[in-house]
Amino acid sequence: MIYLASKSPRRAELLKKINVEFLLLEAEIEENLVLEGSPAFNAEKLAKEKCSQGIKNAIATNLENYPVLAADTIVVMGNKIYGKPKSSDHAFTMLSELSGQVHEVITGVSVGAWDSEKADIATTVSYTHLRAHETN
């Protein structure tokens, strides 16, 4: 059993696909990108903050001591950093800009327990061209 410190339906779906038992854990943080260091630094920093907040919330609410998994993904194309879309229209605009372009998808991952935490980052992808109906 683990706690997932994320509101991402995709992260929950991925854990279900690999048969990991998990409980969702509240881990609200200010998700503003810090414009210091690399995008990878930012993704890792946000993942660590989510994990730490999740652990604090679990302790404060007397939950059992299970590992906490948190992640944050940042997309980078050229000099532009894409954060979370603010609406479905914003998501459509972002996907349209990325469609057919090579860009980086950087995910910071943090796993922690009451007394320790580990974080890492990974991945570059090539994106195929998307048709308008595929982004809806």
Listing of model-derived features with the role each one plays in the protein:
Residues 67-73:
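Ordered, amphipathic secondary-structure segments that act as subunit-interaction surfaces
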